[in-house]
Amino acid sequence: MFTIRHKGLRISPSLSATRELMKEGKTLFDVLEILEKGYDAPRKRKHGIIEKWINKGNKTYNVVVAEDYDDIMKEDIWKLIHFGKFTRRRIK
């Protein structure tokens, strides 16, 4: 079965994150690109949670994933808990 993996763990979106991806017209391949090529967010997160940002044009996309365990597949996964976009502003 074909799955998208980051650091050896499968990426599985939550229901709300799936809705956020659909709203922006993005896929898990875009999430993987942000996780691999993006930079760390300026704010701190708990241990086991990763937040990455990537700039595209005047927009910044952010991804938040947390380490989790999938009871059905019996494996550790990255649970996508947030996907967002915001506009960067120039500082005057």
Please identify what each model-predicted range represents.
Residues 1-92:
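Ribonuclease/tRNase effector modules and their secretory precursors
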